Design a protein with these regions (language model features):
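RNase III-family endoribonuclease catalytic core
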Residues: 2-114, 121-122
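Short acidic capping loops at alpha-helix termini that bridge into adjacent secondary structure
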Residues: 125-128
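Pyridoxal 5′-phosphate
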Residues: 131-132
C-alpha cells in the first residue's frame, strides 16, 4: 500500500459585504472572506493537501485566480474537480484532518454540517473527515 500525505494551508482577509463560506457551508456572520472565488479557506486548504499528496502542484496552478471561470466560483466545485484529478492518477482518500484557526465566529456549532457537506462532495464517509477549530 502506497500512503501519501499532503499539507494544505490558506488564508483570506475577513471583510464586510461578503458571505462567509467554510467547509462548503454558508455561516451567518457579519464578515466574509475576501477572494476571487467564494474564498472558502477550508476547502482551498484541503484541495492543496490533496494535490500536494499526489504531487500535482497546488490549487492556484489548476484553478488560477486570474481565470474568468474561477471568479466567484463555489469552492465545492473546485474540490470535486480536485477529487477527479487525483482519482485520474489512481489515488483515493484515506482521511482529512483539518484545523481552522479563527477566533470568531465560533465554528464548533457548524462542524457537523461542514463534515456532511465535504463528505458528500468528496464521495467519502463522514468518519473520514475531521474538522477542528481553534
Amino acid at each position: 500500500m502506497n500512503i501519501r500525505v499532503g499539507f494544505g494551508y490558506d488564508v483570506h482577509k475577513l471583510v464586510a459585504d461578503r458571505d462567509l463560506w467554510l467547509g462548503g457551508i454558508k455561516i451567518d456572520y457579519e464578515l466574509g472572506l475576501l477572494g476571487h472565488s467564494d474564498a472558502d479557506v477550508l476547502i482551498h486548504a484541503i484541495c492543496d493537501a490533496l494535490l500536494g499528496a499526489a504531487n500535482m502542484r497546488d490549487i492556484g496552478y489548476h484553478f488560477p485566480d486570474t481565470a474568468a471561470e474561477t471568479l466567484n466560483v463555489d469552492s465545492k466545485i473546485l474540490l470535486k474537480k480536485t477529487m477527479d484529478l487525483i482519482a485520474a492518477k489512481g489515488y483515493t482518500l484515506g482521511n482529512i484532518d483539518a484545523t481552522v484557526c479563527a477566533e470568531r465566529p465560533k465554528l464548533n456549532p457548524h462542524v457537523s454540517a461542514m463534515k456532511a457537506c465535504l463528505a458528500e462532495v468528496m464521495g467519502v464517509d463522514e468518519d473520514q473527515i475531521s474538522i477542528k477549530a481553534t
